[in-house]
Amino acid sequence: MSSQSLYKVSGNIAANALVNNDQYKKMYQESIVNPEGFWREHGKRIDWIKPYTKIKKTSFDDHNLSINWFYDGTLNASANCLDRHLAEHSDRVAIIWEGDNASEQRKITYGELHTQVCKFANALRSQGVRRGDIVTIYMPMVPEAAVAMLACARIGAVHSVVFGGFSPDSIASRVIDGKSKVVITADEGMRGGRAIPLKRNIDDALKHPDVTSVEKVIVLKRTGGKVDWVEGRDVWWHSLVETASEHCAIEEMGAEDPLFLLYTSGSTGNPKGVLHTTGGYMVYASMTHEYVFDYKPGEIYWCTADVGWITGHSYMVYGPLANGATVLIHEGIPNHPSPARLGEMIDRHKVNILYTAPTLIRALMAEGKQHFDKYDGSSLRIMGSVGEPINPEAWRWYHEVIGHEHCPIVDTWWQTETGGILITPLPGATDTKPGSATRPFFGVQPALVDNMGNILEGATEGNLVLLDSWPGQMRTVYGDHERFVLTYFKTFRGMYFTGDGARRDEDGYYWITGRVDDVINVSGHRLGTAEVESALVSHELVAEAAVVGYPHDIKGQGIYAYVTLTRGTEESEELRQELRQWVRKEIGALATPDLIQWATGLPKTRSGKIMRRFLRKIAANEVTNLGDASTLADPAVIETLIETRLNRNE
C-alpha cells in the first residue's frame, strides 16, 4: 500500500473493534458474492413482527426497475427504536439535550421517550392522522423533533421533515407536493443566540394559494415567543399530550411501506421528494451506525447534523436509537458563543463518538487551536466526517486538535438517496488517507465509468456509479417515478448514477471529487443551481442568471452568480445586496449567493445553451486554460467575464 500520508489502524483499536481488516475483507466478499445469504443473516439485527422469507428483488434496468428488500416481512420503526429496549434498558438515557444556551439541558431515558412518543402518537390520531398520511415537520433541534418523527412511524404516518432554515416558499412547495394534512412546528427555535420565527414561517407558507391540504398545525411552545393564532387550525402540543394515553399500539408496516419523505435539491429546480421505506432502511441505518462508528453499547454519540437533513434522520434518530445508543442533540451551533463550545460539550457530556461536517472543522481551524487549550477530549474514541469531501488540511487538524491523534476518523460518503453510508473506513479495519472515503461498506458495489458508461479498471478517475442495490436505497421520487428513473438510471444503463465524480487510487481507495451535475454542495448541504437561478430571475430587474459553485475556504463550495440585468438597469452594490436578500427570502439563508458578478452576456452555444464549464473555471479563478471555446456564439463574452471576475487571488 502507498505510504503517502497513511494513518495505520492502531493495534489497540483493531483488537477491540467490531471488525479488523481480515474480517472486513471476508464479510465484504460474502456480501457481494452471496448478497441474499449475507442480508438474510444481517436483517435479523432488527425486530420483525412477521419475519421475512424473501430478501432481495432488485434490478437497475431502467425499463424494469425494481428495488425490494425483506419484502414479505412486517415491522414498526418506532418499536425498533424504543419498545425493543424497554425490558433491559428502560432507564438508559436515550437523549441528552443541550440548548443553544448551555444552561438549558435535559436527559430523557428510553422509558420516558417511549411514553412521550406514545402520547404524541395518540395526539396525532386525535387530529385525524391515519396510516399513509404525510405529516410535515418544521422543528428546532429539540427532543420533540425526534418524538414527532417516531410518533408518525408508530402509527404508520409518513413524515416529511423540512430544515428549519428554509423559507416559507420552500416550505410551501414541500407541503404542496406531499399534500400534508398536518404540520408540526414550534413557536420559535434558537440558533446562535437568535430566535428563528418558525411558526411565522409556517403561517406565511400556508398562505400560498396552492396549499389546500393542511387541516391542523400543532405548535410546540419552545421559547414562549408571541405567535399569531388561527382558530380551528392551530393547536398547542402541550394541550394535546396532556390528556393523551401513554399506551399506543404500533401499526404493523410492510417492509416496503413508506417511512419518510425528505426533499433534496435536483438539477432541474424543483426539489424532489426522496421516498424511503421501512424494512431495508432500518436494517441499513442501524448496521452502518454500529459498524462505521464501531459503536459499543451504552456509548454517548453526538451527530451535529440538523434533523432536517438525511444525516439527522439516519445517524441522529433511527440508526443510533435502534442500537440503544445515548444520543446528544444540540439546539445551536457548535462554535457559538465561542469556538470553544465544541470541546466544552465533548467534555461536559463525555462524548465517545463525534460525527460532524468539514464546514465546521474549517470554521474552527480559521479561529485557531488556542480555543481548545482547556479541552480534555479523553472520552472521545471515534470521529466522523460527513456532507462533503474533507480536504487533507482540515482532516489533519481534526485528527490532531479534536482527536489528540488517537481517534480514527471515518470520512463517510453517502447521499440523501442512499439512506446510509456507502463508502467509508471502518475504525478497526481501514488504514486511512486524509481526504479519501476509502472503501465500500458491505453490499455496496461502486464503479467508475467514462462518459459513455464503460467501466474503468484500476487507478483512474470517472463518474461514480453503483452496480447493485443495497437495503437503504430510496425507492422512488414521491409522485414522479419517471423522474426517479430518469435522474438515476438513464444516464448509465443498468447502473445507479450518483451525480458525483471520483478517483480511485492504486490501493483501491475512493476519493470523491465533487458533483458532475448542476448541484452545488454548500456547507455539506445540496442546492440545485437551477433553484437559485429561478429565484434570481424572478426579480423584476434580472433578465438572466447562471449559478455555479466555486472553492470556498469555510463552506467547501460557495455560490457564485452571474447576473444579466434588464435593459436600462444600473449596476450597483445596493442592487447586489438586494438580490442576495431576495434569494434568501425565496429559498433560505443557505442559498444566499456569496458573489454576484454583473454580466452583460453569458457564454452560450449557437443553440442558446449556457456553457457552464467556462463559468465554473472563471468563478474558480482558473482563467489560463479554459479549453475549446469554438462552439460559443460570441467568444468575446468570455474575455469580458474574466476581466470583471470577483474571485481574484491577487
UniProtKB/Swiss-Prot annotation:
List the InterPro entries: Ac_CoA_lig, ACAS_N, AMP-bd_C, AMP-bd_C_sf, AMP-binding_CS, AMP-dep_synth/lig_dom, ANL_N_sf
- Gene3D superfamilies for the chain: 3.30.300.30, N-terminal domain of ligase-like
List the record's Gene Ontology CC terms alphabetically.
cytosol
Molecular functions (GO terms): acetate-CoA ligase activity; AMP binding; ATP binding; metal ion binding
The UniProt record gives the binding positions of CoA as R191, G192, G193, R194, T311, N335, S523, R584
GO BP, sorted A to Z: acetyl-CoA biosynthetic process from acetate
Q: Where does Mg(2+) bind?
A: V537, H539, V542
Catalysed conversion reaction: acetate + ATP + CoA = acetyl-CoA + AMP + diphosphate
Superkingdom of the source species: Bacteria
Q: Provide the record's note on post-translational modification.
A: Acetylated. Deacetylation by the SIR2-homolog deacetylase activates the enzyme.
Q: Which residues carry this modification: N6-acetyllysine?
A: K609
- Please give the cofactor(s) recorded in the UniProt entry for this protein: Mg(2+)
Enzyme class, broadest EC rank: ligase
Keyword NAD appears in the UniProt entry: no
Documented EC number(s): 6.2.1.1
Detail which positions bind ATP.
Answer: G387, E388, P389, D411, T412, W413, W414, Q415, T416, D500, R515, R526
S-S bonds:
none
Keywords from UniProt, A to Z, are: Acetylation, ATP-binding, Ligase, Magnesium, Metal-binding, Nucleotide-binding
Annotated family: Belongs to the ATP-dependent AMP-binding enzyme family.
* NCBIfam families the record matches: Ac_CoA_lig_AcsA, PRK00174.1
Its biological purpose is as follows: Catalyzes the conversion of acetate into acetyl-CoA (AcCoA), an essential intermediate at the junction of anabolic and catabolic pathways. AcsA undergoes a two-step reaction. In the first half reaction, AcsA combines acetate with ATP to form acetyl-adenylate (AcAMP) intermediate. In the second half reaction, it can then transfer the acetyl group from AcAMP to the sulfhydryl group of CoA, forming the product AcCoA.
Protein name listed in UniProt: Acetyl-coenzyme A synthetase
**Annotated gene:** acsA
